[in-house]
Amino acid sequence: MMRKKRTGIGKKRGAGELLPYGGRNPPRRIWCFAVLLLTLLLLSEFAAFAADDGTEAQTGVLEEAGLSLPSEYGEVVQGLPDEVKELLPEGADGSDADLTAKAVERMSEPGYWKELLVRVTGVELGEALRLFARLCALLALSSVFAAVRSSFGSDSLSKAIGFCSTGAIFAAILHIEYRQLEAVSLFFERLNSLMLGMIPVTGTLWAMGGNVNTAAMSGSTLYVFLTVSEQLCARLVIPVCGILTTLALCNSLSPEVGLRSLGNAIRKVYTFFLGLVMTLLLALLSSQNTLCAAADSTGARTAKLVSSTIIPTVGGSVGETLRTVASGVQYLKSVVGISGIFFILLLLLPTLISLLLTRLAFLLGSGVAEILGCEGEGKLLGELGSVYGCMTSVVAMTSVMFILALNLFVRTATALM
């Protein structure tokens, strides 16, 4: 009697029912693939600065064409916070295009970001550990009070002690909540200031490469991006997180009211609406950028064809000069675009790591509260962890939106090529 071979398509569930995708949830694979694809897209841009031969060749092109970085680029670097400028390599101020290119090449090395990540994580990890230790101490006291109040047998006294315990924990972390909201507000202010300074820089480089229509379109769309970042993120995230924190406190003090579902609904609607708006804006920018770049390229090629037809010798010389200039402009675009991405990451990393570690401290505190039998305090800490998850998603989505916009600026070819 022959045995049937196992196909390995799925796992058994119940009475022979098969679970597809090896027993795992397929959307999780899709999200992991999307994150990996975005990472590879960014690394493909950064890898352009890893080879010294390419840098030296483009340096010769810049010298031959007489090109330099726009003066607005230096103003963008000077407008960065002091703690960010201290992290920049020497020559990144934009005064010399060759030195700036070498500085961007230095920033594209993995060792640079590894050192920066270790430094920032070390600072923020100490704050998170102190917060977790403070929460554990308060939860231990709450557990002792819970044991004491159970011996009295009075429901009113038990509720009063539980109310005081939850209020004490909330009062202890209130200044941390205020500090994080202030840091998020400052991050959006700096991010918007950075991108506001990058708009004239990108517009100048677009015009230098012959992409006049693309310069006008890209600048207007980036202004819309800044409006969305200011109105939906900078001004709205703090009131939303304040409402979620208030609902979390009320839900932990009076669980019978049932405000947890309302807080979850507000958080999901806000993040979904923000993600939808940013997706539409990126789709609009990419489509308009492609169409305008194609129109500019067609116009430039037509002009070169006419000049080479009417005056063959002079036209051929002009075409060769234009190709040299276009190569230099494309290199300057890469330097400016990738340095802008690095500036965004330098602004993002401290805020993002601080939010993630603080959220982790609250979630671990919620687990400790459940172990010690502090149900109300555990609910409060768990809800606060969700609030920090909302802040983290808003900060990350806004940064990714501007990073993809700059990546599109780098990858679009100049019209003179």
Question: For each of these PLM feature ranges, what is it?
Answer:
Residues 150-155, 254-270, 370-378:
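Membrane interface segments of multi-pass transport proteins and intramembrane proteases
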Residues 334-375, 383:
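Helical hairpin unit composed of two closely spaced alpha helices linked by a short loop
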Residues 218, 222-339, 343, 347:
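Generic multipass alpha-helical transmembrane bundles of integral membrane proteins
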Residues 18-19, 26-27, 33:
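Short, low-complexity intrinsically disordered segments enriched in A/P/G/S/L with frequent Arg
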Residues 354-362, 366-370, 374, 389, ...:
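Membrane-helix cytosolic exit motif
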Residues 164-176, 195-212, 232-244:
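Mid-bilayer segments of alpha-helical transmembrane spans in multi-pass integral membrane proteins
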